[in-house]
């Protein structure tokens, strides 16, 4: 039934786990690894394409390579944290419209996070997109910001630890 597509999953994690012989937590981690590789690759390609586009249109200002690499790495960590969160949410909530809705709210948090107080940006993975802004204009001058490497590292450690903890607990749940 086409109308029920977004609200029901076609396969329950525990049913899939039971038929495949792989634990639910391992399935989540495998999904993260496969999708994470794609997300990481696309993030690097996007970064390279932006640099190439700047050269193509004739941007002549000096290229801040180390700053750009740091920014790309930061965005990759944030993208992977969002991916991990969305994978867990999709598994834990039966109605997939909830996961979709949370993702849409996250997009708005990412877009408008710059107007939030800094501490609020740290409360969701999407808030980190605003924290990782590499530069902005002050008047007519382009000003580069110091990237929040410590905050991004914290997101990686806390997000990764929570993902491992939750997926490990999936293995102890009854089917």
Where are these regions (language model features)?
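Secretory targeting signals
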Residues: 29-93, 138, 144-148
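Terminal transmembrane helical anchor/hairpin motif
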Residues: 100, 105-175
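Tryptophan-centric aromatic hotspots in well-structured domains and transmembrane helices
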Residues: 12-14, 88, 126-128
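Membrane-interfacial segments
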Residues: 9, 13, 49, 53-61, ...
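Short helix-to-coil transition segments within interhelical loops
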Residues: 16-24
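Short, small-residue-biased leader/transition segments that mark boundaries at the very start
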Residues: 2-10
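Functionally important transmembrane alpha-helices
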Residues: 81-112
